Amino acid sequence: MNGDPVSWLMVEPGWTVVNAHGKKVGKVDEVLGDEQVDIFHGLVVDGKEILAERVADIHEGEIRLAR
């Protein structure tokens, strides 16, 4: 992972998602949240919902899961 962390508002479909060990687990299909009040609910990755509490870090182009 390179660079500084970015906001969940920057995440776009197609970004890579990796597990806590750095192994690729899929790509973002959709970002779940409410931009109006800046609440991040999670992601849809390869058709499966991942809750926000599982997201450890967001860097441009890549999201790392906590577990």
Language-model segments: which ranges?
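Peripheral interaction segments used for macromolecular assembly
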Residues: 1-67
